[in-house]
Curated annotation (Swiss-Prot):
Stored Pfam families: ADH_N (PF08240), ADH_zinc_N (PF00107)
Protein name in the entry: L-threonine 3-dehydrogenase
UniProt cross-references to SUPFAM superfamilies, sorted A to Z: GroES-like (SSF50129), NAD(P)-binding Rossmann-fold domains (SSF51735)
Chief site of localization: cytoplasm
Organism phylogeny: Bacteria, Pseudomonadati, Pseudomonadota, Betaproteobacteria, Burkholderiales
Keyword line: Cytoplasm, Metal-binding, NAD, Oxidoreductase, Zinc
Protein role: Catalyzes the NAD(+)-dependent oxidation of L-threonine to 2-amino-3-ketobutyrate.
Length: 342
């Protein structure tokens, strides 16, 4: 089958032919319709330090996808041939303490599709049936293909009660922008998002952010004054991994505020602990999606009117993957979709 793979230890990916995956007794085989390019895939493309330490070579990659089930293992129940599915990209062990307690998103033995094992940038993908998630007919293939990052945004944004709250989001990448849309959808009062990329800040405005702030030109304090905020933000969602952004967030938080961290800062990042301790801030690290509560909430929000369509800005045939990666690397894109059916 056709697949997009890392064949050599260096930058780039190659469209090649690989063996169609085998289907175990508890697996489903998915014929891929659409995939989306993730920031993780950009790290793999660039072959940065993280990728060099993490990605097996050779291996085909990718973990954001939608397709249909074309084959099932003999032990699979609850699915049928022809079901349209996406899937949880974190394959968990099932036997550690957290898995046995129903907290699979905290599994210490997690294996990532397209990161530690063969991925979805291919015509077919085999995964455990447990990880597959049926997509309702009213949700398009394009939207279903971005459920993985949409899930990151949902898990982060819904970590705390947002109803009537003032929310600060640092980082207007696709996940940050989707988090802004989610926050408004569920009842936040003011949703302010910061970045230095005007293209992505404009996407955030289209998705419903109250204010999209280019912090290279505009003061966050001035924006807070314009919004008549006198006490600081109630909830912070850190999506950038940029130390200066996190510092600004801590300074802007109200006493008793809550902060969720999805962005990954450098390992030795220093912060002002006085801001955390004397303000009584609650800080929570976010990884992946809650299985599968996050997935049900994603579907429910789309079915109740959440519009994520502006975040999908580019579409290409899978054979034109280089154009898709170029769009992502340009910094002037939202989500980029690759079509494996043409």
């Amino acid at each position: 089958m056709k697949a997009l793979a890392k064949l050599e230890r260096g930058p780039g990916l190659t469209l090649t032919r690989v063996k169609r995956p085998e289907v175990g007794h508890n697996d489903v085989l998915i014929k891929i319709h659409r995939t989306a390019i993730c920031g993780t895939d950009i790290h793999i493309w660039k072959w940065d330090d993280w990728a060099q330490k993490t990605i097996p070579v050779p291996m085909h990659v990718g973990h954001e996808y939608v397709g249909e089930i074309v084959e099932m293992g003999q032990e699979v129940r609850g699915f049928a041939i022809g079901d349209r599915v996406s899937g949880e990209g974190h394959i968990t062990c099932g036997f550690c303490r957290n898995c046995r307690a129903g907290r699979r998103h905290l599994c210490r033995n997690t294996v990532g599709v397209g990161v530690n094992r063969e991925g979805a940038f291919a015509e077919y993908l085999a995964i455990p049936a447990f990880n597959a998630f049926k997509i309702p007919p009213e949700i398009s293939d394009d939207l279903a293909s971005i459920f993985d990052p949409f899930g990151n945004a949902t898990h982060t944004a819904l970590s705390f009660n947002l109803v009537g709250e003032d929310v600060l989001i640092t980082g207007a990448g696709p996940i940050g922008v989707m988090a802004a849309a989610i926050a408004k959808h569920v009842g936040a009062r003011n949703v302010v998002i910061t970045d230095i990329n005007d293209y992505r800040l404009e996407l955030a405005r289209k998705m419903g952010a109250t204010r999209a702030v280019n912090v290279s030109r505009e003061s966050l304090r001035d924006v807070m004054a314009d919004l008549h905020m006198t006490e600081g933000f109630d909830v912070g969602l850190e999506m950038s991994g940029v130390p200066s952004a996190f510092t600004s967030m801590l300074e802007a938080m109200n006493h008793g505020g809550k902060v969720a961290l999805l962005g990954i800062p450098p390992a030795q990042t220093a912060i002002d602990w006085n801001q955390v301790i004397f303000k009584g801030l609650e800080i929570k690290g976010i990884y992946g999606r809650e299985m599968f509560e996050t997935w049900y909430k994603m579907v429910a929000m789309l079915q109740s009117g959440l519009d994520l369509s502006p975040i999908i800005t580019h579409r290409f045939a899978a054979d034109d993957y280089e154009k898709g990666f170029a769009a992502m690397l340009s910094g002037e894109s939202g989500k980029v979709i690759l079509d494996w059916t043409v």
